[in-house]
Amino acid sequence: YVQRNGSFSYLNTKTGKMETWNMTDGNDNRANEVALVSKYQFDNGWLWKLNAKYMNAPRANYVDYGGSTISEVAEADGYQLSDGSAYSGLIEGRRTWLHIGKVSNALLTTEMSKQLNNHKLMIGLNEWYYHLNYYSSSFQWAGTVEAYPRTLNHMYVNPLDPTQTAHRSETFGYNELSPEYTKGSENKLALYFTDEWRITPKFKLFYGGRLEYYRMSADQISASRFRGFHLGNFNTYSTAADGSIVATEHSIAPANVTKNKLNYAATLQMTYNVTNQFGLTADATIATRFPRISEYAGTGPTEEQYKRVTIPLVRGGIFYKNSWLDLSSMVTYISKSNNIDQQNLTKPGTSEGKTVLLIYNIQTLGWTTSAEINPFKNFHMHALFTYQKPVYKNYNASVTFSDGQTMSVNANNKIVKEIPQVLIELDPRYDITKNLSAWLSFRYFGKTYANLQEALYFNGHWETFGGINWNVNKNLSLGVSVINIFNEKGAKGTISGSELITKDEAGKYAGKYMSGNYLRPFTVEFNASIKF
């Protein structure tokens, strides 16, 4: 939920000035795009394709909202409603990030392909350029805990105020939590090839590789964030124990980081048809990359933390096909090293948060069975079952709060939060006519952990959808869809402010109010698409 008045005060990270953000500032975005798609068939059998696109978004803004913890306050704590009356009861700490950006990119891909006997060859070239000019500002606020929350104000001392005089404010904690800034570009120039080799009528081998020259040049602010953080030379102020005002000098300026690296990827896939309908398949892929420009918008990796990200994937299984069924069952292993993430850690029972830079690994072993079923004319069913176990590796962090207390989080070998171990998809569709179809979609998400240390979790739940699509003619399409058909209620995702809660401490929160995301309620949507 957001502030009712539609606007709020914040500290601009770039200018260091207090400004007002209106809700529409995050909606009025603009982008222009032009594309060229072409191909040419040579007489000698080679096929040439060229795809090019240029996009410019001079305004690419959006707003993020998050929560922290829920606590109970008394009138003596000084919280007031907008009419000036004192408030007592439950409050939720709220967090907001305002993202302001300008983006442009130019993408070019050209390929040559040809069938040579039992080889299907393809060689291609990528030239991808991306430019980003981006910053974000953050602040905190408090809302009442009720059906229609109201914004609260309280006494706040701005660390940029040399008099250290308290004033009433609805927003506070300016730029303490992960404000971001970067400006620069990245360029990817790559050469790649693939070969689909039909060794025998029953045995097929597919392999390929890609080599990429990657250049990134970005402005980065590696300094830790704090209340009142912004670019420039300035002072923050605090009151000492003896009542004197202490000034602290800051000089915050971006520094350029330039990297020239080689990324690579390779893949190998084998398929063997035991019979005309049944077969075996296996494949292995490895892909690498170095940190992207977007990962320098925060404090970014240091030189010691700048490492290659490696993503290996290995899987194998069986498949079966006939006139009405296409079935496959695969076991998959995948991992990813050196993930870069900024994690906001909240002190349990309070709304105080700190941001830390984390570099960690993820790996998962899973089994997926999927089926495409066409039992009778005009009816199609997609079905999927997945069991997986995604876990964190090398996930350790510690943070020191304002009272001097240091707390740590250790998520090693813990299940990745927000990712269920069991997934089920059921998607039936019936084509009433050539241009009119009805569809349903059922999604089951199994038990899902809501924090990093497996202390809190949500039970499994179903999400349901349905609708009708009508292609009126080549220019007009109409549709109606229903979300949450059975109006299921509940929570999902994560629980705000729970990052540092351990399994041993989870019992303390039984019967306590906590905040997070809820299932989208029963909704009916109508849509129309017009093509010229």
Regions found by a protein language model. Name each.
Residues 309-316, 380, 414-532:
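Conserved C-terminal beta-signal and adjacent last beta-strands/turns
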